[in-house]
Amino acid sequence: MKFLRLLLVPFALVVVLASRLGLPIRFGRIWSDRMGHMAGNMECYLCERKAGLSQGWDFWFHGAEPCNKQLALMLSRVVRIDPTPFTRICAMVNRLFAGWQKHEIDTLQVDRDVANLFDKYPPQLSFTPEEIAHGETQLARMGIPEGAKWVCLIVRDAAKHPHLPYHSYRNADIAAHAPAALALAERGYYVVRMGKDVLHPMPIKHPRIIDFAMQYDDFMAVYLGAHEVTSAACVYFR
């Protein structure tokens, strides 16, 4: 594989040189190992592109194995994502030349909508009719009836990225959020505890409280978040 990548370097050099000759070619790395960044950064980029703030012949590559296959699929419908190592190599070769920043895709402020474009444009990612039908079927299987409203409970768990201890201050105990979940459930909302890697199950039982983290699915992680009433998450103070 390493030898194959070396063989691609001359071709990458041709592409990079072409970009210096006037072709508006740009390369971008998708922050694929973090769902928030994978969705947020790309939504900012797509809205900025729609507003005319980001222009070029843009080619993307995944910076890591996508943390959510459904989200990766939806992104592949609206941006060019190279599944081969070639675009990554082009991005590396690009950085060897002065003025490389001009040929690297960026947003105004990473994953912050500083231009308030989210208020101006609808979500740039969408589900197909077949995916919507599948999502509604899965909701019924989870016990959420048609027309019901749900709140996604997002509590960062110590099982998330245990190899990054400097982020441990962001972790919280799901048990501390149980009273809030119960209060919402008693008001008629369904509460869906989100998450992919968790240490403990939801400590309370209620017909309208669903511990999705214990039955995680890539597709429903996106579908639930896209159709929720709101999210209940942790807020951090310094």
Tell me what each language-model feature is:
Residues 1-238:
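N-terminal targeting/anchoring "stem" of glycan-biosynthesis enzymes
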